[in-house]
């Protein structure tokens, strides 16, 4: 970007470029996946030390819940980078969590606005804000499976047991969305889109 992009910025008022594309380690062209264009904007903003970034969506901004499942949702006028990453990581599809990280690194504000109502303020994502603690947010996730583990000898679920469980979850490439533990049990909630649950159970059956 230093040899191609930055020199153009010095001679042009506006640069139009594509997003969503990248390349593999061996140089082959590929795509960045869901919301890859937003991620591209975050990377370019980081590289050029942009004052701010605006992403245009078909929604008025980031909401505290999905309006498909919840009535009376509230638009979040401003939230912190941390809150935005949490919401997007666990299911809020307006932005991708990777979009936020390069902006957070240089404290570049991110505006999420509606192209249907372009004059509305939308949501600004920036450094820590008091609004995070005032409005609760809700994530609805479908197709979830719940696993509950108890040691065979009813011994306490301590750090060693939890570490063993997560080692196996990592081995089978399973992503945990929610955890809960008590004295003798440990539960995890995961997406129900893996084909190797039985293999996981086989690895766990000797101890749990």
Language-model-detected regions and their locations in the chain:
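C-terminal catalytic "cap/lid" subdomain
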Residues: 1-208
